Amino acid sequence: MIIRQARSTEIRTLAALGVIAWEQAFAAAGEVTNHLREKAEATYFGFCEQYWPIIIAAEIDGETVGWAALEPGQNKITDVWVLPNFQRHGIGTALLSELEQQAVSREFDEVFLETHAKNTPALSFFKKHEYTISGLKSAYSPTMDKSVDTLEMRKRFN
């Protein structure tokens, strides 16, 4: 596995990967509809098109299988996505570790993120990596096209 900077030539691939992983995460909660899928596709493409220089990608045998991003100049993790068939193989852990190293190199003493309160696999993943819940909020989500409950999670570095 290689963790590397994303390339401008793979914006569509990154966006599609994000949508596939998003669908898998929310299908179990009955949250995915064709309308939401279209909104998710537009949201992910827009994000990847604008922010590809800050995205890191995980590659296995020449295939991009995951990506993640840390907000520029901040300590907020915006995304961690891994294709469903490649989950539970250490890819998310490698991406998360790289983002944490970036935050430390920027002299931050912690990182934080927000995740959908019903995204049980994500909550378990981040708890496993020593993230703790630090807040709950309800806000409009462009991807979900409604107000959703999100949990803020933090990890402090010693």
Model-based region annotation:
Residues 5-85, 96-98, 102, 139, ...:
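Acetyl-CoA-dependent GNAT
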Residues 63, 79, 83-97, 104-106, ...:
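Conserved glycine-rich acetyl-CoA-binding loop
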